[in-house]
Amino acid sequence: MASKEMFEDTVEERVINEEYKIWKKNTPFLYDLVMTHALQWPSLTVQWLPEVTKPEGKDYALHWLVLGTHTSDEQNHLVVARVHIPNDDAQFDASHCDSEKGEFGGFGSVTGKIECEIKINHEGEVNRARYMPQNPHIIATKTPSSDVLVFDYTKHPAKPDPSGECNPDLRLRGHQKEGYGLSWNSNLSGHLLSASDDHTVCLWDINAGPKEGKIVDAKAIFTGHSAVVEDVAWHLLHESLFGSVADDQKLMIWDTRSNTTSKPSHLVDAHTAEVNCLSFNPYSEFILATGSADKTVALWDLRNLKLKLHTFESHKDEIFQVHWSPHNETILASSGTDRRLNVWDLSKIGEEQSAEDAEDGPPELLFIHGGHTAKISDFSWNPNEPWVICSVSEDNIMQIWQMAENIYNDEESDVTTPELEGQGS
C-alpha cells in the first residue's frame, strides 16, 4: 500500500513540475508583473499595509507587507517587509524575463527588492495577522494558543530580542483554543473579532484598555456554531453587523446590538461541506461571498439568504481564502489547496462561450494564477495598485503578480498568441 502511495506522490510531483514549467514559459503573455521570492520560513498569512511611498527619481514605489513565520521549532516572528514595485512607466519588456526564475517586470532577479524591515518575536507560528484600519501600526495576530496578541510595531525594535521573549502590547483573552479568523471593524476603531476551534467568536474593544497587566477580556462571546469556526468578518458598511462561517456548514449573520449572543440574526446552510472563509463586498451593502471545502465559492445577498445567488466552480480542492477586489465591485478571488488562485468577474456570469472556452472554465473565471506548486496559505489585494496580488504558499514561496491588462480590459482584443501553451489548471 505504501509503495502505491509513494508512486502516486511521485506522479503528482511530476505533474506539478510540468505544469509549473508551462506556467513559467507563458508568464510574459499572461502577466504585467511577476515577482517570486523564497521566504526563510513559510508564511501562513499575508496582508498589504495601506502605506505607499514613491521615492523621487526612481522607477519604483515602496510598499509594505505584514507576514508571519511558521518555523520548525525555531523562534517565530511577526514580520513587516518592504517591497519595491516598478512604476507603470518603468522601462522593461517581456524579453527581459528571467526564464530561470520565471520573473519579469523590470526585475531580472528580486534580490534586494523584498526585504524584512521589522521582525518581532512571536509565540509559536503566526496563524493570521491583520492590521487595524484606523491605525495600521497596530497588528493583531492569531497564535497556536487561545490568546490573540496585539502589537504596535512602532514600539518594538526592528531587530528582535535574541532571548526570544514575546512581548505583545496587549493579550486578548476569551477563547479556549486556537483559530484563524480575525477581523477589525473598519467603522469602529479598536473593535476586533476572532474565530476559534472552540466553536465561538470573540469580540474585544481594545480601547477599553487592559484590566491588569496587558490582558483584555472579551466584550462578548458568540456561541451559535456547533463546530470549529473557520472565519469571521465585519460588514464593511454597517458597524454592528458581522458574519461567521464554520465546519457546521453554516453561514451566520450577527448584529452586536442584539441582546443575545447565542443566536444569530440569520442562519443559512451555505455549503455541503465545511465553510472556510467569507468576504463582504466593499462596494455593496448586501453582497458577500463564502468559500468551502466543497470546492465552490458561493455568492449571497443579505436581503434573501434563502437563495444562493451563484456558485463559482473551477477549484479542484478545498477553498480557504476568498477576497473581493478593493478596486472593482464585480471582481473577487479565491484560493486554497489546489495551488491555484482564481480571479472571478461577476459581470461575466451567463455570457455565451465557445465550446473550446467552456473547457477552460465558466465565463466568469477571468484568470487562473498557476505560479504556486504548493497549497496557497493566504493572499492579499494591493490597495494602492489595482490588480496586484501577493500570495504565499506552504513551500516558503511568496509571489507578487499582476495579470496582463488585456485580460481584464475588454476594450482590447483577446490574446491570440500562438506561442501560448496549454494553461490547463
Curated annotation (Swiss-Prot):
Ranges for the WD repeats: 47-122, 128-173, 181-217, 228-269, 275-312, 318-369, 376-403
Subcellular location: Nucleus
GO molecular function, one term: histone binding
Gene3D superfamilies given in the database record: YVTN repeat-like/Quinoprotein amine dehydrogenase (2.130.10.10)
Main location class: nucleus
Modification type Phosphoserine: residues: 3, 95, 354
Covalent crosslink: Glycyl lysine isopeptide (Lys-Gly) (interchain with G-Cter in ubiquitin): 4
InterPro entries per record: G-protein_beta_WD-40_rep, Histone-bd_RBBP4-like_N, WD40/YVTN_repeat-like_dom_sf, WD40_repeat_CS, WD40_repeat_dom_sf, WD40_rpt, WD_repeat_RBAP46/RBAP48/MSI1
Residue numbers bearing the Phosphothreonine modification: 10
Positions of modified residues (N6-acetyllysine): 4, 119, 159
Keywords linked to the UniProt accession: Acetylation, Chaperone, Chromatin regulator, DNA replication, Isopeptide bond, Nucleus, Phosphoprotein, Repeat, Repressor, Transcription, Transcription regulation, Ubl conjugation, WD repeat
GO BP annotations, alphabetical order: cellular heat acclimation; chromatin remodeling; DNA replication; negative regulation of cell growth; regulation of DNA-templated transcription
Cross-link (Glycyl lysine isopeptide (Lys-Gly) (interchain with G-Cter in SUMO2)), chain numbering: 4, 101, 155, 159
Superkingdom per UniProt: Eukaryota
Known role: Core histone-binding subunit that may target chromatin remodeling factors, histone acetyltransferases and histone deacetylases to their histone substrates in a manner that is regulated by nucleosomal DNA. Component of several complexes which regulate chromatin metabolism.
Family affiliation: Belongs to the WD repeat RBAP46/RBAP48/MSI1 family.
Official protein name in the record: Histone-binding protein RBBP7
Gene: RBBP7
